[in-house]
Amino acid sequence: MANQEKYAQQMQDAGVCDARGAALCATVKELPDGSFGMVLLGVKGNDLLIYDANMKSEPLKLMRTIPLKGVTDFSTTSLMGEILKGYTFRFTSDGFTYSFKNCRRQAFLDVLQQEINK
């Protein structure tokens, strides 16, 4: 099993994402509650789940669930940006603009885009 497949399976087993394996670590500029930093993102059904990535092997703490059905203004950086430093993507939900950077899994962004477009 390849590393990405193992990672996807671990994330599914932990409940972070569904069978599509759309999960990754990223840096968030700011969440509505003022928190920021490293987070673990997962797409489960039509929701984006945001977990605290505390890096201390503690149980995952769900920080926020964002229904992707109401997301607007989704955008991502170009392929060249991804090659150099990882994707940045942003969107607006309930009047707040979320911005994530250092994302290195195109498959995650593909699933996210599919759910937003439903």
Language model features: what each stretch is:
Residues M1-V43:
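Anionic N-terminal interaction surfaces
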Residues N3, M63, R104-F108:
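Short amphipathic alpha-helical segments
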Residues N3-A14, Y51, T76-T77, T88, ...:
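Membrane-topology and secretion signals of cell-surface/extracellular proteins
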Residues T92-V111:
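Canonical phosphoinositide-binding patch of PH/PH-like domains
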Residues I116-N117:
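IQ-motif-like calmodulin-binding regions
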